[in-house]
């Protein structure tokens, strides 16, 4: 079984968008992702904390799973805890985790010639590097992260900035990656800092533990925030 999994969470503030709370049951938030999943006949799953039965019943063809609210966790860090729980509770062969409102699936990623069982696939940010990125740089305020061997050197380097808004791979490689990522987020997250740490930890983990086992950029994703309409990539991300 192959899955495309995303989240629709409304009980915690979005620190990337001024700490606003997302509205529940907003069809515009899900429509593009949903339509693309249905068109391709993929197994789509949305983990949610507050969607109504009426809203869910109007979106057949995908699976909705109710989860607890984020509680003490930053919203974006909590998402990875949910993804870890999903892979532990469900059998799968291959899986992609994606953002929801700004992602559309263009091609079934699991049948593309570039796809294989030994690679972690993720997005990039138009070839940008980590040095100077706001969300990566904000992690420099987290003293626990700064204590990780090589952390500062990696996130202030000219290494390619990786985007975890589209991330996937086979059960063989993605399970260990997600579990390790989640464990590190739980250990390093700092609730007193008004930024999420998942992006910096994601990049750090790739470059320290999976440097020879990842692929980023086209054909996995379109150019980030360019709102492209193209058919030569697996995912359009904004």
Describe each PLM feature range.
Residues 1-93, 172:
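N-terminal anchoring/stem segment of glycosyltransferases
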Residues 4-5, 45-48, 95-99, 105, ...:
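A structural signal for short, well-ordered beta-strand segments and their strand-loop junctions
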Residues 12-15, 53-56, 103-107, 112-114, ...:
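Short catalytic/ligand-binding loop motif for oxyanion handling, primarily in non-cytosolic enzymes
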Residues 32, 82, 104, 200-201:
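Short amphipathic alpha-helical face segments that pack within enzyme cores
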Residues 34, 57-59, 66-68, 92-100, ...:
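Viral RNA-dependent RNA polymerase
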Residues 80-136:
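GT-A fold catalytic core of metal-dependent nucleotide-sugar glycosyltransferases
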Residues 118-167, 199:
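PAPS-dependent sulfotransferase catalytic domain
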Residues 150-238:
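Catalytic core and acceptor-binding pocket of nucleotide-sugar-dependent glycosyltransferases
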């Amino acid at each position: 079984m192959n899955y495309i999994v995303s989240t629709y969470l409304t009980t915690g503030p979005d620190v990337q968008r001024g700490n606003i709370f997302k509205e529940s049951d907003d069809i515009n938030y899900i429509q593009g992702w949903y339509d693309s999943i249905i068109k391709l006949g993929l197994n789509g799953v949305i983990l949610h904390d507050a969607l109504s039965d009426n809203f869910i019943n109007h979106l057949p063809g995908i699976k909705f799973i109710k989860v607890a609210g984020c509680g003490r966790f930053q919203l974006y860090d909590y998402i990875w805890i949910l993804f870890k729980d999903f892979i532990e509770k469900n059998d799968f062969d291959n899986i992609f985790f994606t953002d929801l409102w700004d992602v559309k699936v263009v091609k079934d990623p699991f049948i593309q010639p570039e796809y294989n069982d030994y690679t972690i696939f993720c997005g990039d940010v138009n070839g940008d590097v980590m040095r100077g990125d706001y969300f990566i740089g904000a992690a420099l305020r987290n003293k626990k992260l700064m204590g990780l061997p090589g952390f500062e050197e990696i996130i202030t380097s000219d290494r390619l900035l990786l985007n975890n808004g589209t991330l996937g791979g086979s059960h063989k490689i993605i399970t260990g990656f997600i579990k390790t990522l989640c464990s590190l987020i739980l250990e390093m997250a700092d609730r007193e800092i008004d930024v999420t740490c998942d992006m910096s930890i994601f990049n750090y983990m790739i470059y320290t533990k999976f440097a020879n086992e990842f692929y980023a950029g086209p054909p996995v994703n379109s150019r980030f925030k360019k709102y492209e309409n193209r058919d030569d990539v697996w995912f359009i991300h904004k």
